[in-house]
Amino acid sequence: PHVELTTHISDATCVKCHNRSGRIGLSYFGHYETEEYGTPFMNGGPSHYNILGNPDRYYLDLPPDVHYAKAHMSCIDCHTMPDTMGLGLHYKNMTQQVGITCKDCHEPHFVQVPPNSLALKLAFLNGKVPLKVGDFAAIEERTGQIIYNVQLIDSKAVFFSKETGKAIPYPFLC
């Protein structure tokens, strides 16, 4: 059978790679890798907190990111399709590799969704986030891409979970 093509990329898929260096994949969910990779002890016995089933890497708990703790946002809720794996260009700073910024959702600018836009296609493929021509959705200021899961409805900003389609009205700001 063929591998399923989906817009529902799981957090587990992201963390398989994004668990080193800045460890954002771990810290977002409230985990911190210990300095001593091979220190599996907790309360005088072996720890069950190993990373991705690797018996040589262990983590400690820390407070999760506010977006995960309060809104249970998934990686794909912020990381849009065009920049899921970066924009494909060379930058001096890795934070420039993705198009979306905090301001795009926390101080959004809304545009009317035009016919045949990528946002309409992505929302259709997603199947959980409602979006139609003429709706108002936020844009990435850096790239001009429409963020289809952040919309203006009845003069209120609404965030939609790409995973569940659940509408979360603002403010859920930090």
What are these regions (language model features)?
Residues 1-174:
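Primarily the internal scaffold of c-type cytochrome electron-transfer domains
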